[in-house]
């Protein structure tokens, strides 16, 4: 029990280091990258309770940009490991739930400071190696965003605990905020180290225990996350990491009566399937599970005739091609007015041709490799379709090569059909499709933006006319959960732009805000009457 009312240190966003030539952080991360690259024998275990669990099934880990090189192996589990992880979580739950909220906060605040200091180079290097992010993309993800999640979430937790009801004379009303009764299942993606950690840490902070299944292609940095949490003092069993096939884990988790919540980032199809499975088993559960998910996107950039050409071009290049377009928020469809297209096309093509591609070890590279062969083959299929289409002209890029790494050129295609395949479907790669519209058709184009895709994650409007900005913001109110004015549709900062979308893009529970943490607590109202009545009768009965 706490003996005081405590104030969490007020969070500010972690400054992004520059990694410019001559800076100490540049030398440190390069040294760590090369050290980890040449380790070769790393063996990533599963973390179940206080045990590092290894199996006979060893899966190789290789850099996407150098897929013949083996960084090491991770251990693949099965049904028994998932069951053991659930048992370990439930065993840890009573003590973790009873720990005062400020003590839980202290653990994750320490983890943030460890990431900001001694673990910064390691988690960035791991993300560069195994997820093929350039150093800037690794820094804003694995270091800064993760640090921000941990610090801001502690602040948001205090905000939640401060929400208390009014009391009348003779009565004291109060609210307490409990973890969910059972365990939370976290299924996390490859593309953001920070998201993978936060999907575990956010519910854990609120007093929950976690079974975590990371993406196979993110296990390398997932191990560093577990190292950080352990160094910060997280008790054994609070977060349990298992690596196995998704259906294997799901078959155990979704039939367990103590399943209390799903925290998910991944594809829309998988999320819908999981929701269906939970629905089928709803009668098995002790409580109705909380379901929180952020899924796909087909994110747009809409330029108005009043837009600045250079701002649009920069927004398109950064929004579409940073991290090879493998962000849920990446710009993948653009609508450009005829009056600006000639100038935008010239500068856009020139910029894309300037982009260097290769290993993240070479800091001049803007783009590196896509995550794995399956992703490469899928994207290459879209490129083939674009090249063969009578409705499309590829004006930049269009080639791919997987001989050494899974490299796909940043590609810009122009279509005459605004509902063509690459304007509708999520590609998750460095492919931008542009539709050029008559200036007079802006109203119709907004309808097109709103109805073309099943998703509603991010979008951007570029315009100088304030009336246009106001009108587009209102007209496209449900087209994107994160809407950007004169900026690229990526790069949401924790505490500044809470992230998430609706429609086919998820439950819009806004990671990076207090809204997400509310989903991971079960409130209890306590009413205390100081002088209770001593007879059942009411005055009207006299």
Regions found by a protein language model. Name each.
Residues 3-9, 14-18, 65-74, 91, ...:
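Conserved C-terminal structural/oligomerization subdomain of aldehyde/semialdehyde dehydrogenase
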Residues 228-233, 255-256, 261, 269-418, ...:
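ALDH superfamily catalytic-core signature
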Residues 126-133, 165-169, 362-368:
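Short linear capping/connector segments at secondary-structure termini
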Residues 1-70:
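Hydrophobic face of amphipathic alpha-helices that form TPR/SEL1-like repeat modules
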Residues 133-134, 210-213, 237, 257, ...:
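Short beta-alpha connecting loops at secondary-structure transitions
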Residues 55-56, 60-62, 67-161, 446, ...:
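Glycine-rich loop-to-alpha-helix module at the N-terminal edge of alpha/beta enzyme cores
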Residues 68, 89, 104, 127, ...:
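Residue-level signal for inorganic ion chemistry
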Residues 128, 147, 157-311, 508:
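Rossmann-like NAD(P) dinucleotide-binding subdomain of oxidoreductase/dehydrogenase enzymes
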């Amino acid at each position: 029990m706490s003996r005081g009312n405590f104030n969490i240190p007020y969070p500010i966003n972690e400054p992004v280091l520059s990694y410019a030539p001559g800076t100490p952080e540049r030398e440190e991360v390069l040294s760590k990258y090369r050290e980890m690259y040449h380790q070769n024998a790393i063996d990533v275990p599963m973390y179940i309770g206080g045990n590092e669990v290894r199996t006979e099934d060893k899966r190789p880990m290789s850099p996407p940009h150098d897929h013949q090189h083996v960084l090491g192996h991770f251990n693949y589990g099965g049904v028994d490991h998932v069951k053991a992880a659930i048992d370990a979580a439930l065993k840890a739950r009573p003590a973790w739930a009873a720990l005062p909220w400020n003590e839980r906060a202290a653990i994750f605040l320490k983890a943030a400071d460890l990431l900001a200091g001694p673990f910064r180079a390691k988690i960035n290097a791991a993300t560069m190696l195994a997820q093929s992010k350039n150093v800037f993309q690794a820094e804003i993800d694995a270091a800064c965003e993760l640090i921000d999640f941990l610090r801001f979430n502690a602040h948001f937790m205090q905000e939640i605990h401060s929400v208390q009801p009014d009391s009348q004379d003779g009565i004291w009303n109060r609210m307490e905020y409990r973890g969910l009764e059972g365990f939370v299942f976290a299924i996390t993606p490859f593309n953001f180290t920070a998201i993978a950690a936060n999907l575990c840490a956010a519910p854990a902070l609120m007093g929950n225990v976690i079974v975590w299944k990371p993406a196979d292609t993110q296990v390398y940095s997932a191990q560093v996350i577990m190292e950080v949490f352990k160094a910060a003092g997280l008790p054994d069993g609070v977060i349990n990491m298992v690596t196995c096939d998704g259906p294997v884990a799901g078959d155990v988790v979704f039939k367990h009566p103590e399943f209390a919540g799903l925290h998910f980032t991944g594809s829309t199809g998988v999320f819908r399937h999981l929701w269906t499975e939970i629905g089928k088993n709803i009668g098995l559960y002790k409580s109705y599970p909380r379901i929180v998910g952020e899924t796909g996107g087909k994110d747009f950039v809409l330029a108005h005739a009043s837009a600045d050409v250079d701002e649009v071009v920069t927004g398109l290049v950064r929004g579409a091609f940073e991290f090879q377009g493998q962000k849920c928020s990446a710009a993948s469809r653009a609508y450009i007015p005829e009056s600006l297209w000639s100038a935008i096309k010239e500068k856009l093509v020139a910029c894309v041709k300037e982009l260097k591609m290769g290993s993240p070890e070479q800091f001049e590279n803007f783009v590196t490799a896509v995550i794995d062969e399956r992703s490469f083959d899928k994207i290459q299929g879209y490129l083939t379709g674009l090249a063969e289409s009578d409705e499309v002209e590829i004006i930049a890029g269009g080639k791919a090569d997987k001989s050494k790494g899974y490299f796909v050129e940043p590609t810009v295609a122009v279509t005459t059909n605004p509902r063509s395949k690459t304007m509708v479907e999520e590609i998750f790669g460095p492919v931008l499709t542009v539709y050029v519209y008559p200036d007079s058709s802006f109203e119709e184009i907004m309808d097109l933006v709103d109805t073309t895709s099943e998703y509603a994650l991010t979008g951007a409007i570029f315009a100088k006319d304030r009336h246009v900005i106001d009108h587009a913001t209102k007209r496209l109110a449900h087209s994107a959960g994160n809407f950007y004015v004169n900026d690229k549709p990526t790069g949401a900062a924790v505490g500044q732009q809470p992230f998430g979308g609706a429609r086919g893009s998820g439950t819009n529970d806004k990671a990076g805000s207090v809204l997400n943490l509310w989903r991971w607590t079960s409130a209890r109202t306590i009413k205390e009457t100081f002088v209770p009545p001593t007879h059942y009768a009411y005055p009207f009965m006299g």
